[in-house]
A protein has these predicted regions:
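Transmembrane helix-bundle core of multi-pass membrane transporters
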Residues: 7-10, 103-160
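Alpha-helical transmembrane segments in multi-pass membrane proteins
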Residues: 23-31, 57, 61, 72-84, ...
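Cytosolic-side transmembrane-helix boundaries in multi-pass membrane proteins
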Residues: 255-284
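Transmembrane alpha-helical segments in multi-pass inner-membrane proteins
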Residues: 203-259
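Hydrophobic alpha-helical transmembrane segments
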Residues: 21-25, 70-75, 97-101, 145-150, ...
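Short loop segments and helix-boundary regions at transmembrane helix junctions
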Residues: 36-121, 221-233, 250-254, 277-278
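Helix-loop-helix "hairpin" substructures at the membrane interface of multi-pass membrane proteins
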Residues: 140-217
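Membrane-interfacial amphipathic/re-entrant helices at transmembrane-helix boundaries
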Residues: 1-29
Length: 284
């Protein structure tokens, strides 16, 4: 135990480890806040669809040889979020079909572009890193950390400022419209915020694992608590704790950061399931 603590203390002295912890906590917090809303609206796989769009956008940036791909990926993902929302409201193309269509299309086009216009000698490594997250936390630069901090503050501020409206749109959209709430506007706001979170999380967990940050904390919290506020707070706390444990475990074990975080979240979901079952029996 002493050896482990000494090893952690040694690693925490390095800036790149602190960067990973900061980014991991902020991304976990933001994704869990929106995750509860997306799960309750049965739109949780929008994160999966947009993450594949972000992969395609990164492929375009690689083809154009853009060194700082973040702005381009952000713009394309936000535009896709808006289009996805509009397409999902189409009576001929339902929400789940729209997500599947955009998700698979973006993933295929992205991989095709990376093969045709490959500028790297290690294409398989680049694709694996993009899909499953960087195997090394050394890739997080100070610029990315500050960008993540700024965007995370914006996301949390939006959620707090419009909490009541988001709550109304989440539970009964028709009633919210009847009371004068512009449900379409707040749905659009949610989609844009999710797009921002997706782009920020890609370097940490990769495009294929982002949905886990959205889904698992919300489902875990719902097993224990019933009210929207309690579920949201619990999901945020669980997500932050799992990210911290996952990052620290990946440092000690030398495993990929994203996969380790998701594995910890799966374990937390299992414990929450057991706790919910025990509480359910006790209440009876």
């Amino acid at each position: 135990m002493t050896a482990i603590l000494e090893k952690l203390t040694l690693y925490l002295a390095y800036p790149f480890v602190r960067y990973a912890l900061i980014v991991g906590v902020l991304i976990a917090l933001c994704s869990s806040l929106l995750g509860v809303t997306l799960v309750l609206k049965r739109f949780s796989f929008i994160g999966d669809g947009l993450s594949h769009v972000a992969f395609g956008a990164m492929a375009i940036a690689a083809v154009l040889q853009i060194t700082n791909e973040m702005p381009l990926v952000m713009v394309i993902t936000v535009i896709s979020a808006v289009l996805l929302l509009r397409t999902g409201q189409n009576t001929k193309i339902k929400g789940d079909a729209a997500i599947a269509m955009i998700s698979v299309g973006a993933l295929a086009i992205g991989y095709l572009l990376m093969n045709i216009f490959s500028t790297s000698s290690n294409l398989s490594g680049d694709v694996c890193s993009t899909l499953f997250g960087s195997t090394s936390i050394l890739t997080l630069s100070p610029v990315e950390v500050w960008l993540c901090v700024g965007m995370s503050v914006l996301v949390v501020a939006v959620f707090i400022l419009f909490y009541n409206k988001i709550f109304a749109v989440t539970f009964d959209e028709n009633f919210a419209r009847a009371t004068g709430t512009k449900a379409g506007l707040y749905n659009l706001l949610i989609a844009i915020v999710v797009a921002v979170i997706i782009v920020l999380a890609m370097n940490l967990v990769g495009s294929l694992l982002i949905s886990a940050l959205v889904i698992f904390p919300a489902l875990s919290a719902m097993r224990i608590f019933k009210s929207f506020r309690s579920v949201t707070v619990c999901a945020a706390a669980l997500s932050v704790a799992c990210s911290l444990i996952g990052i620290l475990a990946s440092i000690l074990a030398g495993t990929p950061v994203g996969s380790t975080i998701v594995a910890v979240q799966i374990g937390a979901f299992g414990l929450s399931w057991l706790a919910g079952t025990v509480l359910g029996v006790a209440r009876k």
